[in-house]
Structure formats: structure tokens, C-alpha cells
């Protein structure tokens, strides 16, 4: 639960040294705060939460996490460009906060173009349900509170679909008697005078109430815990103040007390009672409240190395390849330092894999070897698995690009191995440009346009190579667009502006770092050379971006709104040891506005032995790294207002199974040998249909669309059959004929089906699959049985345990049947339908009105009964797929 309390307190600033990360290939060290200046590029974006669902009327905060070419990550939520592909279903603002408009599903995309004209984006699906609010509940119920104290209320909504989300920040809070008690927009009530008041939470036409009694009890004494603790420098110690009142009731008054440290050079205190060791020594910690006080002596010792983290964790490399491991030392003062070059590296089995003094692992022969990094009597291990595969081809992407002279393009080399697996080998290939007068390319695959013309960019490894053509244009700048437009900003806050250029050849590019930025009224707002604006005083100023004779402006309004409260999300998340969690801080201001203040607040972890904040000196990023199993309070504070949540760290997850390579079948929502039939009322979204061994006439029940291959029941997809003539039917690229495309699809379906029968899966031990899956919760793994399997007695819950890449494989020797009274599949903690595979040696029957998730590979028939909803894919290897008024959405 979040708590927000405003106080006057001293802000102690610390000078944090930026820790430089060593590059894998001997590049110059890069400071993450200057990525663009040092050639560090944005390589990917991850949007969380993944595929969320919420009832109409609520809001969903999305977070965008950027990963850079030097291996670092940072929260880019506030600088990314957010978009919804259907604003009639849901809208999203510039801070990633989405609001539903009507029931339906939309693609939410976060994109960012860095100063090298390198664009990355990520998309997730937001589902707005038509679930209606059936009940509201407030907790705690009918509490008592001493005058002058505060009480946090929580509102929980129960919806018609059975979900019960926390709606504390979505409801409207009110107090019937504000002379007795007040309540703010976050549900925090304050006792003003003796008496009682009805506290109401309302959402739409629904509301619920509870009674808050304010007593005249007076504070008799305060007790502090722990008593005389000792901590290492940099460690945070949480103190608790318990007040005993004249009526005999004891209350936690930690958040209401005024905290102080007698020697702030030794230890500092925040407003929530957390002390942080600054230097060696002792200081008296005092809590004051309502004329009472209590003290405790805090002793601070020197900082020490507390743990080592190795990345990547448990990697796989082909025989003959190398892999750079990184060792990060976590110190008690919260500093994370790259100790790769100073650690002592060793391999438990040098016949399988060796490791040099710089942490570079070489795969010698197939098998597994434990790699250890040791420093200061501490060590960390990871298991490197060497696979007996060889590189068969190299692909360079994106293909055939056109860029403007003077700009850059990041290229990626992907290797395909003899076992069909793919790997990003960008950093290990040799890059070259056929014409360096036109374009150059560095050893990280970053191509630069030098002069107009074209050049072949190649990536090679041994005798293998892949290439793409890069065209450099000398297009003229036609216009500039500044975004976001007509922004409102709270005084003291920052906002990143972007300038997008449109050239005479129709191309566009981010020129944010090459334009000249200006503010018409620098007393109201300033803006730096990179387009970062800062609100100085209430008023308006015109922000302008200029390049040559072209310019564009937008109005920036600065308000003097004050920060009322902070929300930290996600609330009380759980992650595994050695992983990370990105927190988002949202500020609620006195003018009713909300702003993403993730990069502005000060972040702290109450127990840095469990979790640290902002590793590698990514200042105020809100990124927590899990060090040990346990829990730690994560706090965000700004201007005397703070909020906290609890991060729970669990043990590392078991090995993740390898998923099959789908090849051409990945494009299909349904693929069948003999036929695909439906009754009226079916809807298929985001995937193609295919019949492998029969003519197009074996599609039954579908309504032909305007163009060849289209069905009215099929959205964002086409249907295919082996006898389709061309034209009017269009053969997918790169195939020369429809027959060739169908043959390849048949081959890829067989490969995936056979892979799912592998025992054991190359990356995880096979477990026995229960013959009844109802009322079970299963974690990732391979589940196998020779018998028939049913899902009928209840709901099957698949738990991703916080890893959105968790793979679930069910290999069934008979039939799979779901249906009443159970039959639903529920995905929690990051589990995704696209990573679930059902392989049956018989038929698969999906029960009436059930909700099914996963990719079905059935040897014979797939029968989806009336009203069932499927998120995944349906493949009938030798038979047909039968629908009956169903909704099928391909899992992407």
C-alpha cells in the first residue's frame, strides 16, 4: 500500500560517481548518462505490463524500459512516444497512462528515436473489457484514529468477470464532515477534530462508505525499534516509532513522526524513519511527535562488498563461439560496480568451456560448465551450456534501408545454427562496407552515411556472410515538427521535447540533438541543447526548434501546482533473484494533473542486501536489482512527499524449456490438413488461415471478402490453399508459387510437432503431466503423459513467476478435452499465450464457453465448441479445425 505524507525536512544531497561499464569488444568505456555522445545506441524497448486487461473506466500505467548497446537499461517511459492504434477503444497520454473508451483490444506502442536516427519500438496489447462494477469495498472498516494522525484507506472493486482490482486511485474520495476528518485523492484520511465522519469512495454510479472515528486520546509515550542498531556505510536502517495513547491503544506513528539525526555527516534520515549510513561513526536518531520523543543510537561501519551478480545468467553458446560475461559487484552503500576485469574467473570444466581473465567464455565441446567469478572472498556462478551446433547462415537486418547523409543506422546480424536456433551475433561478426566513401560501419554494426550513393554492408564470420544494401540520400529538409504539442508542466519538473524532420524524398528522421532549441521566455522555462525543458515559474513560453531556414514551435505552459501525493507502481511486485524490476512514480498535483516523475524522485531501498536501486549509477531510474531472497521497502520521495511499495525477491526460476521454431506457421492463426469450417458468429484476429492438403472449397461457413483470400470473419489476415491461382491470389514473399509456400508451411508444421515430442526438452527436465488439469497451478516446464488429458473440474492457472518468456509445453499421448464445469485457462505473473504449446497425439476439444490459451498442435481434429474463446493458434496436422461461433486471436 502506498503512503504519501507531506512534511518539512532537510534534503541532504550526495555526490554520486558515475561508474563506467567496460565494453565487450574493447570499446571505450561509456557513461550511460551520455549514451548518444559515446556511440551507445538504443537496441530494444520492453513495455510492461504485458498484455494487460482492465474493465472500462479504469486506467493502466505502462512503463517503457530501454536497453542499450553497452548492456545497460534505463526507464524511458517519459521520453518515449506513446500511441494507441485505435483511440476509439483506448487512449494513451505522453506519460504512458492509458484509459479505456469502449470495450475492445488495442495495440499500445512505445517508440523512441535516438540522436543517431536509430529507432526502436515495442508493442503490447491492452484489452478493455465490458465487465461492470458489481461492488465496492473500503478497508479498513470503521477504524478509529487519534486526532492529528492519518489513516490510509484502500478501495477494491469487484467486477462482473470475477476480477477484483485495486481502484484506490480511480475512485473519488470524500469525507462527510471535513471539520472532523479530511481525505485526499489517494484515500489518505487525516483526523482534524474529535467526532466521526463518513468516508465515501465512489466510482461512476457506485459508492461505498465506512465510518472514521476521531478520538481525543493523547500521546503518552514513543518507543523506537530497533534499539542501538549497527549498519555498514550505505546501508539503510528502517526505524519504527510506536506511540502509546492515553486510551491504552498503541499505534504505528512512524510516518507521522518528525525524524532527525544528530550527526548528518554520519547518517541521514528521511521522513519515513529510514536512516542511511553516510560515513563511519555514531549518531543519535530521534523521533518527535505531539510533544513526545524517543531516541536510538545508530552506529555506521565501513562499506563492504555484499554480493556479485553475473550476466547473462545461465547462457547457451554454440561450440566454437565466445561469450562475454559481466561481473557486477554490489556494495553495502548501494553502489554497483563493474568488477569484470578485477574478478578472478574460473571454469569447473575446461574441457567444455574456458574463461579468460576478462570474463570471455569460449565453448570447447558440448556440455555444461559452471563459471565462477570471485572477489573479496565472495563469489557468484552461472552455468554455461555449450551446444553442438554450427553456424549455417547470417542475416543482416533491417534490409535495404535508406538514410539521410550524416545520419546513422543500427544493423543487426542474426545467425542461424544447424539445430535451427537463432542468435544475435552482431558483436561477434566482422562488419564491412563495400564503398566506404558512401557509408562506413563500425564493429558494432552501426552504419553511417558519408556521401550520397549506395553501399553493400556485410557481416561475416569465417566463410559465411550476410549483407544488405544501404542507400544514402542528400534530401533537403522540408519541415520540422516539435512534439509533444501544447504541453502543461509543473514548475520544477522537466519534459523532453523531440524534433522530427521531413525531407524532400519523404523520409523522416529524429533531429532533436542537431536542431537549435530556444525558449521565448527563459524566466518561465529553459530548454537545453538536447530539447530537455525545465519549468522555472508559472506562465507560458514558446518552445522552438530551428535548423537552417526551417523551424517549428509549440507552447509550453508552466503551472505552480504543488505535489499532493505519489503513486509507486507496480504495487508489491515479486521478482526472482538476480533479475530487475522497473518502478514508476506518478505524481498527483494540486491542479488535478498527474505526471510521470520516475526520473525526478529520489529512490531508495530499505534493505540493500535484498535489493538495490539504480544500478550502475543510473540516477533516479527507479530500477531495482534483486540481490538476495527476502523483501525490501522501495521508496520514492520528492519535495517532502513520499510513497513506498514492497519488493519481494524469490529464488531463481528453474531452467526454461526451449520453444519450437515455428517458421512459416508462425503467421497462421489456424492451419489444417483437410478443412477449416465455422458456423456464423466466429471472429478470427491477427493471423492467416491455411489448408494444406485440400482445395480452397474445403473452407466452409466463411463469407468471402472484397479481395481474394479475404473473409469477413477474418481481421488482419488472409486465407490460403494449395489450388489458389495467382492472380488473383497473392503468393507470400519470397515464394515463387502458392504450392511452394504451402509445402514449406507443411514442412515447418511437422518440424514443430516433432520437436514438441522431444524427451527431454534440451533445456528442461520433463515432468509427468496430470491427467486432470482443473484446479491446478503449474509453473514453466515440459509436462508429458501417454494418456488422455482433461481440463474439466476447474480452472488451470499457468504461473510465469515474473518471467514473460516462461515456456509451457504439454505433450499428450492421447486426446485433450476441456469443458464444464471448468475448462478455463488463467495466466498470471507474466505467463503469455504465445509461449504455451499443446501437442496431442489425438484430437483436441475446447469446451463450450471456455477461455483457452496456447498453441494447439493436434495430430487429428481440433474442435472448438460453441462460444469458446481462444488466444493462440490452432493446428490440425492430419485433419480439420472446426469452429462454432468462436473468437480466436492469434497470440503474438
From Swiss-Prot:
Location of the protein in the cell: Cell outer membrane
UniProt keyword Signal, yes or no: yes
Membrane topology: Lipid-anchor
Species in which this protein is naturally found: Shewanella frigidimarina (strain NCIMB 400)
Main location (coarse class): membrane
Pfam family, one: Big_2
Function of the protein: Ice-binding adhesion protein that adsorbs this bacterium onto ice to maintain a favorable position in its aquatic habitat. Inhibits growth of the ice crystals. Has high thermal hysteresis (TH) activity, which is the ability to lower the freezing point of an aqueous solution below its melting point. The TH activity of this protein is approximately 1.4 degrees Celsius at 25 uM and little below 2 degrees Celsius at 80 uM.
Sequence ranges assigned to domain BIG2 in this UniProt record: 43-111, 134-205, 221-288, 306-386, 392-471, 478-558, 565-638
The keyword NADP appears for this protein: no
Lipid attachment in record (S-diacylglycerol cysteine): 24
Record keywords: Antifreeze protein, Cell outer membrane, Lipoprotein, Membrane, Palmitate, Signal
Protein family (similarity comment): Belongs to the ice-binding protein family.
Cellular component, GO annotation: cell outer membrane
Motif (Ice-binding site motif (T-A/G-X-T/N)): 866-869
Lipid group attachment sites (N-palmitoyl cysteine): 24
Protein name per its UniProtKB record: Ice-binding protein 1
Amino acid at each position: 500500500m502506498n503512503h504519501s505524507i507531506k512534511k518539512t525536512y532537510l534534503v541532504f544531497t550526495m555526490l554520486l560517481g558515475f561508474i563506467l561499464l567496460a565494453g565487450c569488444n574493447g570499446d571505450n568505456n561509456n557513461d550511460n548518462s551520455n549514451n548518444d555522445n559515446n556511440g551507445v545506441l538504443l537496441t530494444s524497448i520492453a513495455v510492461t505490463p504485458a498484455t494487460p486487461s482492465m474493465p472500462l473506466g479504469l486506467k493502466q500505467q505502462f512503463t517503457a524500459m530501454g536497453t542499450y548497446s553497452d548492456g545497460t537499461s534505463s526507464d524511458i517511459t517519459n521520453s518515449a512516444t506513446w500511441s494507441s492504434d485505435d483511440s476509439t477503444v483506448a487512449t494513451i497520454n505522453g506519460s504512458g497512462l492509458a484509459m479505456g473508451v469502449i470495450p475492445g483490444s488495442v495495440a499500445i506502442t512505445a517508440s523512441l528515436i535516438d540522436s543517431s536516427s536509430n529507432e526502436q519500438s515495442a508493442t503490447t496489447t491492452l484489452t478493455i473489457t465490458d465487465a461492470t462494477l458489481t461492488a465496492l469495498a473500503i478497508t479498513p472498516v470503521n477504524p478509529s484514529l487519534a486526532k492529528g494522525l492519518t489513516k490510509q484507506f484502500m478501495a477494491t472493486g469487484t467486477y462482473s468477470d470475477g476480477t477484483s482490482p485495486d481502484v484506490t486511485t480511480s475512485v473519488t474520495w470524500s469525507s462527510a464532515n471535513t471539520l472532523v476528518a479530511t481525505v485526499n485523492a489517494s484515500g489518505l484520511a487525516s483526523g482534524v477534530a474529535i467526532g466521526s465522519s463518513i468516508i465515501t469512495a465512489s466510482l461512476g454510479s457506485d459508492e461505498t462508505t465506512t465510518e472514521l472515528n476521531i478520538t481525543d486520546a493523547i500521546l503518552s509515550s514513543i518507543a523506537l525499534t530497533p534499539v542501538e542498531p549497527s549498519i555498514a556505510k550505505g546501508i539503510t536502517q528502517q526505524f519504527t516509532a510506536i506511540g502509546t495513547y492515553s486510551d491504552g491503544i498503541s499505534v504505528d506513528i512512524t510516518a507521522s513522526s518528525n525524524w532527525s539525526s544528530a550527526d548528518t555527516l554520519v547518517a541521514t534520515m528521511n521522513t519515513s524513519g529510514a536512516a542511511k549510513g553516510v560515513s563511519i561513526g555514531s549518531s543519535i536518531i530521534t523521533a518527535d511527535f505531539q510533544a513526545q520523543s524517543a531516541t536510538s543510537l545508530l552506529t555506521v561501519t565501513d562499506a563492504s562488498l555484499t554480493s556479485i551478480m553475473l550476466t547473462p545468467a545461465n547462457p547457451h553458446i554454440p561450440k566454437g563461439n565466445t561469450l562475454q560475461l559481466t561481473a557486477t559487484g554490489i556494495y553495502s552503500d548501494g553502489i554497483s560496480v563493474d568488477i569484470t576485469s578485477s574478478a578472478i574467473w574460473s571454469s569447473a570444466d575446461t574441457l567444455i568451456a574456458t574463461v579468460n581473465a576478462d570474463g570471455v567464455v569460449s565453448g570447447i565441446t558440448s556440455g555444461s560448465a559452471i563459471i565462477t567469478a570471485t572477489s573479496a572472498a565472495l563469489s557468484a556462478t552461472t552455468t554455461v551450456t555449450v551446444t553442438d551446433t554450427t553456424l549455417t547462415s547470417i542475416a543482416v537486418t533491417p534490409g535495404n534501408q535508406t538514410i539521410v547523409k550524416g545520419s546513422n543506422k543500427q544493423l543487426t546480424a542474426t545467425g542461424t545454427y544447424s539445430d535451427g536456433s537463432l542468435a544475435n551475433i552482431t558483436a561477434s561478426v566482422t562488419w564491412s562496407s563495400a564503398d566506404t566513401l558512401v557509408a562506413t560501419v563500425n564493429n558494432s554494426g552501426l552504419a553511417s552515411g558519408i556521401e550520397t550513393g549506395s553501399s553493400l554492408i556485410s557481416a561475416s564470420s569465417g566463410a559465411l556472410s550476410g549483407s544488405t544494401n544501404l542507400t544514402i540520400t542528400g534530401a533537403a529538409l522540408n519541415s520540422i515538427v516539435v512534439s509533444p504539442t501544447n504541453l502543461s508542466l509543473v514548475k520544477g519538473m522537466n519534459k523532453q521535447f523531440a524534433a522530427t524532420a521531413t525531407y524532400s524524398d519523404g523520409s523522416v528522421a529524429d533531429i532533436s540533438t542537431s536542431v537549435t532549441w530556444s525558449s521565448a521566455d527563459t524566466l518561465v522555462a529553459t530548454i537545453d541543447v538536447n530539447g530537455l525543458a525545465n519549468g522555472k515559474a508559472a506562465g507560458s513560453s514558446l518552445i522552438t526548434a530551428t535548423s537552417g531556414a526551417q523551424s517549428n514551435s509549440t507552447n509550453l505552459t508552466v503551472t505552480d501546482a504543488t505535489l499532493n501525493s505519489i503513486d509507486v507502481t507496480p504495487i508489491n511486485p515479486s521478482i526472482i533473484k538476480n533479475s530487475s524490476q522497473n518502478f514508476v512514480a506518478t505524481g498527483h498535483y494540486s491542479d488535478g494533473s498527474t505526471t510521470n516523475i520516475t526520473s525526478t524522485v529520489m529512490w531508495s531501498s530499505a534493505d540493500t542486501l535484498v535489493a538495490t536501486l539504480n544500478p550502475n549509477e543510473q540516477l533516479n531510474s527507479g530500477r531495482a536489482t534483486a540481490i538476495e531472497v527476502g523483501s525490501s521497502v522501495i521508496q520514492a520521495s520528492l519535495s517532502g512527499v513520499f510513497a513506498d511499495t514492497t519488493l519481494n525477491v524469490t529464488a531463481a526460476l528453474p531452467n526454461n524449456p526451449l520453444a519450437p521454431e515455428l517458421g512459416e506457421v508462425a503467421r497462421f492463426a489456424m492451419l489444417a490438413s483437410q478443412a477449416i469450417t465455422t458456423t456464423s458468429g466466429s471472429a478470427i484476429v491477427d493471423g492467416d488461415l491455411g489448408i494444406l492438403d485440400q482445395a480452397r472449397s474445403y473452407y466452409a461457413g466463411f463469407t468471402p471478402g472484397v479481395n481474394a483470400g479475404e473473409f469477413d470473419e477474418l481481421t488482419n489476415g488472409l486465407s490460403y490453399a494449395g489450388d489458389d491461382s495467382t492472380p488473383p491470389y497473392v503468393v507470400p514473399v519470397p515464394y515463387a508459387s502458392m504450392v511452394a509456400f504451402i509445402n514449406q508451411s507443411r514442412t515447418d508444421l511437422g518440424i514443430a510437432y516433432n520437436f514438441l515430442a522431444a524427451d527431454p526438452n534440451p533445456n528442461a527436465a520433463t515432468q509427468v503431466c496430470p491427467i486432470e488439469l482443473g484446479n491446478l497451478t503449474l509453473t514453466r516446464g515440459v509436462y508429458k503423459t501417454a494418456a488422455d488429458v482433461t481440463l474439466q473440474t476447474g480452472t488451470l492457472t499457468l504461473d510465469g513467476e515474473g518471467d514473460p518468456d516462461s515456456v509451457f509445453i504439454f505433450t499428450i499421448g492421447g486426446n485433450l478435452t476441456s469443458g464444464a464445469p471448468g475448462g478455463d485457462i488463467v495466466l498470471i505473473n507474466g505467463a503469455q499465450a504465445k509461449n504455451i504449446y499443446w501437442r496431442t497425439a489425438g484430437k483436441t476439444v475446447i469446451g463450450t464457453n471456455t477461455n483457452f490459451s496456447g498453441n494447439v498442435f493436434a495430430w487429428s481434429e481440433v474442435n472448438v465448441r460453441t462460444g469458446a474463446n481462444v488466444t493462440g493458434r490452432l493446428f490440425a496436422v492430419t485433419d480439420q479445425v472446426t469452429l462454432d461461433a468462436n473468437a480466436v486471436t492469434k497470440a503474438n
